[in-house]
Amino acid sequence: MLSENTINIVKSTAPLLAETGPKLTAHFYQRMFEHNPELKDIFNMSNQRNGDQREALFNAICAYASNIDNLPALLGAVEKIAHKHSSFLITADQYQIVGGHLLATIDELFSPGQAVLDAWAEAYGVLANVFIQREEQIYQDNQSQTGGWRGLREFELVEKQYESAHICSFVFKPVDGGSVVSFKPGQYLGIYINDEQFENQEIRQYSLSSSVRPDCYRISVKREEGGRVSNYLHDHLDVGSKVKLAAPAGDFFLDAAPTAPVVLISAGVGLTPTLSMLESLTEHQAPVTWIHATENGQQHAFKQHVKQLVETHPHFNSLVWYNQPNSDDKIGDDFQFSGWVNLHEIETVLKQADVQVYFCGPVGFMQFIAKQLLEMGVPEQQFHYECFGPHKVV
């Protein structure tokens, strides 16, 4: 329990942190990687270069300082981060390293005096313990389940299939021949790549793109321009290749009552977690609406698969938007609408009582979707979203 004095001191530093901006976290990361270069094997260095990770950490630090007297407000963020940390196999001793560099950064940038440093040390220690305990619980839960494991497990690529011009599916089975731990539709898998072409180990999380299978996992990866790992997987990972995986994790997952209508909204490769959800809703007792946006038919992944699911399950419905249809794309067959997704055109679907909405895609797309949902009066607690990469609020 934090003392009132600590709470007051940390809260008083919030305006200074906000004024400093991401310069704070840029200094922190530069310092940490200089003194502990081994941590480059854990952090996504691409997110370091584009600034996304710095921005995410800065927002988290500011949120903690501002809400230190109202920690329940941070529980959602803690759960999201703890799951991501478990996929990176973060350990308790690494929290000590990070804490040391955070305090040194505050001291070097602001010279705030020992009282402020002591307050932040106490506050960081409390928060670190919350994460350590929650992450240990996640590790133990995974390990204790049938097919579960802790740490890394070696898998073999047994199937590789292109779903569109830029999205490829990869199916992995454990080398030891055992079963695999179950997951919640919408969760992701941690994949660890060690290759001589990379200076450091590369770790990525990719959404599981199928319903639960007892002996394998499927991810579907978009080839991103300049994406180090996505291009590596597309170009160098072939059937028979071995990779190491961390157990499934993630706080974005299907959690709808059996009688609640479900709407799944995605753009581009954002369909991977929602497809896992769709495949898991074949016995659902309420209507399920699949809404997908993509550029055109060439970019439309899993088109036939979703069409077959809809045809064989009367409670399923599919609505597709093509931003710029090709000449051979057929309206009414390949897609129903063109341009940007306009949810007001299908307002009755979103205004069903107790509807649960799950959406995923580029940040701009999700912000646009969230804005429309709020305009239509869908309560915030009834929509759920996932950001690929460092979390952003939509």
Swiss-Prot record:
Transmembrane segments: none annotated. The record marks 29 as: Involved in heme-bound ligand stabilization and O-O bond activation. Consists of two distinct domains; an N-terminal heme-containing oxygen-binding domain and a C-terminal reductase domain with binding sites for FAD and NAD(P)H. It holds the Pfam family NAD_binding_1. Its EC number is 1.14.12.17. Disulfide bonds: none annotated. It comes from Vibrio vulnificus (strain CMCP6). Its cofactor is heme b; FAD. This is Flavohemoprotein. It catalyses: 2 nitric oxide + NADPH + 2 O2 = 2 nitrate + NADP(+) + H(+); 2 nitric oxide + NADH + 2 O2 = 2 nitrate + NAD(+) + H(+). Binds 1 heme b (iron(II)-protoporphyrin IX) group per subunit. One of its GO terms (biological process) is response to toxic substance. Residues 1-136 form the Globin domain. GO terms for molecular function: FAD binding; heme binding; metal ion binding; nitric oxide dioxygenase NAD(P)H activity; oxygen binding; oxygen carrier activity. NADP(+) binds at residues 268-273.
